[in-house]
């Protein structure tokens, strides 16, 4: 599938992809900058990422690694990766012939946004209801 179709679909969806270099486009969603990688060697490979969205320190290094692992287990298709002291998110997909690009791109962007949100909330110590549910804390019995 030609990347011109993907770029056109992003424009139809209201995004404004900007060419960064020969194989890279950037576009904005909410407060995020997303990158679309054009793999000239493989037209069927689609990759959208949120690069270097979090920088961690030695103090929170283990928490960061644990949170990356948790999000990777929780959100399908998105991979959080660590490069040096930065966390990035990527969604990679192999395109088929009759792909519904609007549905696919919406799913990819939503999954990336969700991963980022869950990661940041967990790093700030917030509880995620569906993730941090503890049945022992859900005691309906009251002492009268």
Segments from the language model and where they lie:
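Ampiphathic alpha-helical segments that act as solvent-exposed interaction surfaces
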Residues: 65-75, 101-127
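Hydrophobic residues embedded in beta-strands of well-ordered beta-sheets
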Residues: 24-25, 43-46, 87
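Charge-rich, low-complexity N-terminal segments
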Residues: 1-35
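Short beta-strand micro-motifs enriched in acidic
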Residues: 18-20, 37-41, 83
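Short, internal acidic amphipathic alpha-helical interface segments
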Residues: 51-90, 144
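Long, continuous compositionally biased terminal/linker segments
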Residues: 30-60
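Short, highly charged C-terminal tails/helix-capping segments
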Residues: 124-144
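A mid-sequence interfacial segment
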Residues: 79-115
């Amino acid at each position: 599938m030609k990347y011109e179709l993907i770029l056109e679909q992003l424009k139809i969806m209201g995004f404004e992809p900007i060419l960064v270099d020969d194989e890279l486009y950037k576009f904005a969603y909410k407060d995020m900058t997303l990158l679309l990688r054009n793999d000239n060697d493989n037209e069927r490979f689609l990759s959208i990422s949120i690069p270097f969205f979090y920088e961690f320190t030695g103090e929170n290094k283990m928490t960061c690694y644990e949170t990356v692992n948790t999000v990777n287990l929780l959100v399908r298709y998105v991979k959080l990766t660590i490069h040096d002291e930065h966390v990035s998110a990527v969604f990679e997909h192999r395109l088929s012939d009759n792909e519904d690009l609007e549905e696919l791109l919406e799913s990819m962007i939503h999954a990336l946004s969700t991963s980022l949100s869950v990661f940041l909330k967990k790093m700030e110590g917030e509880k995620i209801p569906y993730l941090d549910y503890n049945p022992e804390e859900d005691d309906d019995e009251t002492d009268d």
